Regions:
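RNA-contacting regions in translation and RNA-metabolism proteins
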Residues: 1-160
Length: 160
């Protein structure tokens, strides 16, 4: 694990420096959670003006993470999950999506009308599904294709 962490920090630091950013990489091993079935390496970038590394809805961050995983896992000939974050953006986004899901569910429960959320990547749709899976008045469905795939929050019939 130490070798992987050192290599990942080195490669990520070098990559973001070549992209024109001045950022510190903080590495830590995390225990399994809702998004990860096993221990994973979290690399959190800290610095000024790093918003461009996140990109629209985290797209740039996800692409950077994908490339780093490929580079590290190919060099070490083993696969371990690596999560790249910028100043805990992913955690803040998860909290925002959970709150959005709960507010939207309340709206659907009151109105009795379905509500479609904005298109989201698979990991974000999963957070919404998990946030509402035990809700007494609504259920969720995914619809659409590819990047246009989104969640529909539907009222349960028969009062829950």
């Amino acid at each position: 694990e130490a070798e992987m962490a050192a290599l990942a920090v080195e490669l990520l630091s070098e990559t973001v420096r070549h992209m024109g950013f001045d950022a510190e990489v903080v590495a830590s091993w995390q225990e399994p959670d809702a998004d990860n079935d096993e221990r994973y390496l979290l690399l959190d970038l800290h610095g000024r003006d790093l918003g461009a590394l996140i990109g629209r809805r985290g797209d740039t961050l996800s692409n950077l993470q994908y490339l780093l995983r490929l580079m590290v896992n190919q060099r070490l000939h083993q696969w371990k999950n690596i999560v790249v974050d910028v100043e805990q953006y992913r955690q803040r986004r998860a909290e925002h999506l959970t709150q959005l899901a709960l507010r939207s569910a309340d709206q659907v429960a009151k109105s009795g009308r379905p509500l479609a959320l904005e298109p989201m990547p698979p990991n974000e749709r999963r957070l919404v599904h998990l946030a509402l899976r035990d809700h007494p008045s609504v259920y969720t469905e995914s619809s659409g294709e590819g990047e246009r795939r989104k969640i529909q929050i539907m009222p349960k019939r028969g009062g829950g």
